[in-house]
């Protein structure tokens, strides 16, 4: 426990919060170009082929972003919008691609949670 005079001399040190998505540089989303689109396998108790893309953002940083939903139309040189948000069972994947914006189409035949997958209202 510091004395009052010690606090007057030094003061308390602020604890700085570390960001979970540093490549976005405090922006809500960033645009980028797909460098490579591929599948990868999740960590131990789970088993699947998760769709991910390596994206070069407009600030020059390359990140791995998850492609949510069933099926996608992304390939190399596609322009995508990247938001924060990690995938728990994929190490190193700390970003999501926003469906239904730029070159990334929405999910087909999606009835529920449509806004998260960029799908228009069915007739």
From Swiss-Prot:
The keyword tRNA-binding applies. GO terms for biological process: translation. Keywords: Methylation, Ribonucleoprotein, Ribosomal protein, RNA-binding, rRNA-binding, tRNA-binding. Disulfide bonds: none annotated. SUPFAM superfamilies: Nucleic acid-binding proteins. Transmembrane segments: none annotated. The modification 3-methylthioaspartic acid is found at residue 89. Gene3D superfamilies: Nucleic acid-binding proteins. GO terms for molecular function: rRNA binding; structural constituent of ribosome; tRNA binding. GO terms for cellular component: ribosome; small ribosomal subunit. Residues 1-23 are annotated as: Disordered. With S4 and S5 plays an important role in translational accuracy. Interacts with and stabilizes bases of the 16S rRNA that are involved in tRNA selection in the A site and with the mRNA backbone. Located at the interface of the 30S and 50S subunits, it traverses the body of the 30S subunit contacting proteins on the other side and probably holding the rRNA structure together. The combined cluster of proteins S8, S12 and S17 appears to hold together the shoulder and platform of the 30S subunit. HAMAP family: Ribosomal_uS12_B. Belongs to the universal ribosomal protein uS12 family. Part of the 30S ribosomal subunit. Contacts proteins S8 and S17. May interact with IF1 in the 30S initiation complex. This is Small ribosomal subunit protein uS12. It comes from Thermodesulfovibrio yellowstonii (strain ATCC 51303 / DSM 11347 / YP87). The gene is rpsL.
């Amino acid at each position: 426990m510091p004395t009052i005079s010690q606090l007057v001399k030094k003061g308390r040190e602020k604890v700085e919060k570390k960001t979970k998505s540093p490549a976005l540089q405090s922006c809500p989303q960033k645009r980028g170009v797909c460098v490579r689109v591929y599948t990868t396998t999740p960590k131990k108790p789970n088993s699947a082929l998760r769709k991910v893309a390596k994206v070069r953002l407009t600030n020059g940083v390359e990140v791995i972003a998850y492609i949510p939903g069933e099926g996608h139309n992304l390939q190399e040189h596609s322009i995508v919008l990247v938001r924060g948000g990690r995938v728990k069972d994929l190490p190193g994947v700390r970003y999501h691609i926003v469906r239904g914006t730029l070159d990334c189409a929405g999910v087909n035949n999606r009835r529920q949670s449509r806004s998260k997958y960029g799908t228009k209202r069915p007739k």
